[in-house]
């Protein structure tokens, strides 16, 4: 999920030319992200883990908690199941995104010298399908839990 959000956000910022420094940072980061050694270097792993897993998960979960409690005008204790399912979905999508990114960005090009398909396109298709399936499952799970609470 966040593997799709971060590049899309940087591309949108770049398309509107808001800041030259943000563009240079994004270009530098994704140039190093495409190199195969970046995944297994200490800096690369820590920055990927922080940027694509820890920070978005904490931010989205916190925003989701406040949004749920504000929209439903209830205290946080009544919606713990929805918050836990939301957190589980974010963590699963982030872990899946990192695994797919390493698989299609590093291991698959090592196995084949020339691939008959675009690695980036295939990765985005798999991530999009996984996001749709996981989001649908989380919605169904949340609705079932809500029915059990009511």
Swiss-Prot record:
Q: Which domain of life is it from?
A: Bacteria
Q: Which organism is it from?
A: Mycoplasma pneumoniae (strain ATCC 29342 / M129 / Subtype 1)
Ranges annotated as spanning the membrane: 48-68, 89-109, 123-143
| Alphabetically ordered keywords of this record | Cell membrane, Membrane, Transmembrane, Transmembrane helix
Family membership noted in the UniProt record: To M.pneumoniae MPN_085 central region.
Bilayer disposition of the protein: Multi-pass membrane protein
- Please tell me one Gene Ontology term that the record gives under cellular component: plasma membrane
**Which subcellular locations apply to this protein?**
Cell membrane
Name this protein carries in UniProt: Uncharacterized protein MPN_087
